Amino acid sequence: TRAFGVRLDLGVAPVFIDTTGDGDLGALAGCSFEYGESDSCPCQPMSLNALLVVKDAAALASVTHASDPSAKDNLAKDAFLAEIKRAGLFPSYSKPTLWQVRDNLMLVMMNHEYGIKPFDAAQVTEATVRARGELNKIVNALRKLGGPWEGVQIAATAEQIGVRDGRRIAGRYTVNKDDLVAGARHDDA
């Protein structure tokens, strides 16, 4: 709806609850909002992950993130980046990560899209298309390396790119750092 200039008719119901995740309803109702950290700091990057099917996940152990907060995980990310570079590419996300989901099904994160307004449908669509293109280009290049990458395929991606940082509707009160430090409680929460 955000792409079509929809206006909100407040007379339809006594209460509206915005569950869009992007603050669309609040924005349509005329509420002010912010996004990013400040005017000079854009939103966090968006990313599109993919599920990959590989021939032998065990053969990719050196590039697979173990979800362990040890230095080994950074080594796996660096090794995965080295493989992408060996294929002649450099991903938009400089810490690409590969996880084993189960058996020969892997999850990959190697794309970031920067400076995209999360409430602009055209920008989100363009970012999604670019991200899919990048994922396919990298996977195709890895496949050409052969070895453990032989036959690697994208099994699935999300419907659209993942948004980390959308609108934050301005409410009656904004929780701040001091509230968090003090463990503040609010009667209406």
Where are these regions (language model features)?
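Flavin (FAD/FMN)-binding glycine-rich loop and adjacent Rossmann-like elements that form
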Residues: 2-15, 19-189
